[in-house]
Amino acid sequence: MPDKFKRVHVIVMDSVGIGEAPDAAKFGDFDVDTFGHIAKHVGGLKMPEMGKLGLSNIREIDGIKKAEKPLAYYTKMQEASNGKDTMTGHWEIMGLYIDTPFRVFPDGFPDDLINQIEEKTGRKVIGNKPASGTEIMAELGEEHVKTGALIVYTSADSVLQIAAHEDVVPLEELYEICEFCREITLDDPYMLGRIIARPFVGEPGAFVRTPNRHDYALKPFKPTVMDALKDGGKDVIAIGKISDIFDGEGVTESIRTKSNMDGMDQFIAVLDKDFNGMSFLNLVDFDALFGHRRDPQGYADALVDFDGRLVEVMEKLTDDDLLIITADHGNDPTYSGTDHTREFVPLLVYSPRFKNGGSELELRKTFADLGATVADNFEVKMPEYGTSFLKDLK
């Protein structure tokens, strides 16, 4: 390719897998297919923009026509790392191989961990289940205020959260408790991605979180492509939970989002900025609101809504832009349980510069090929892991 792209935009549709990975059984997953099963469930998906890019050329999806002349280069990527969680997927996309998976606790944390927290703090633990923070605060907040017990909960991700009223557990104490939890969960058997302090105030029936949240994350164990870009003087604009996933490493600007649609609003606003580097967007609602909750209809509606926003995105792209759409794992809402699913993820790569459209790329054996391509484009330090496909984009 003659000239490099000035801007690369990566959109991660969180959990939008495109069919069972060859090693899915090792992860307890059988006949999983997020995109395919959602499309079947609703009698076909209406996603004309993704269709034009070449989504059904990767493999046929009910309701989405195969493009005769796809606008994008297309293929699917296979995860190499030993995990199927958000952090593993994103870290691999940016050039790391993860051998030990981060742990998730869909049934709450083991007694041994809870006992350690109770012994260290002298406080009982209540909750200990996956929950929405606002819901568990409403459910257990009054008991917490009366007894001083700690509200401990998790989510579908690798996280331990502790909610406490600021008048019951002073902030300093809450932070110390979270630091202790961070220390004891760095390795197996817990290996948690993040500990979060969730302070709140108010009266029963009217509890509200305060801005004093504090995250104790794991930093990536090696520099990622984002670090290479930042060190090379390039912009790395993280939108949504990207900055949290990388604990701020390699990020030059972080933009928070409230929802998928807000994420698309923020992303489209970033397209109007003059920058040289990468924008990196995570759309978490697919996973958090519909995948884990096993809601195929809601998931389908969210996919259709996303597709509708691509019209605005495409209008703003120039020959200096490269758009990459992918996912970080699967989360088949028609499958049993509530966990992620081990799947291939789609890869669509588009630029208005491709005057003759795109074509099929080789199957990628690791998500890290995406990061390697970004590094190659900006001529920064290449990751140890991953092979660039930049030269295949004509």
Swiss-Prot record:
Documented EC number(s): 5.4.2.7
Cofactor stoichiometry and binding remark: Binds 2 manganese ions.
Stored InterPro entries: Alkaline_phosphatase_core_sf (IPR017850), DeoB (IPR010045), Metalloenzyme (IPR006124), Phosphopentomutase_DeoB_cap_sf (IPR024052)
GO MF assignments: magnesium ion binding; manganese ion binding; phosphopentomutase activity
GO biological process, one term: nucleotide metabolic process
Binding locations of Mn(2+) 2: 287, 292, 340
GO CC terms, sorted: cytosol
Function according to Swiss-Prot or TrEMBL: Isomerase that catalyzes the conversion of deoxy-ribose 1-phosphate (dRib-1-P) and ribose 1-phosphate (Rib-1-P) to deoxy-ribose 5-phosphate (dRib-5-P) and ribose 5-phosphate (Rib-5-P), respectively.
Entry-linked HAMAP family: Phosphopentomut
Entries under PANTHER family matching the protein: PHOSPHOPENTOMUTASE
Family of the protein in this entry: Belongs to the phosphopentomutase family.
Protein name per Swiss-Prot or TrEMBL: Phosphopentomutase
Protein source organism: Listeria monocytogenes serotype 4a (strain HCC23)
Gene label: deoB
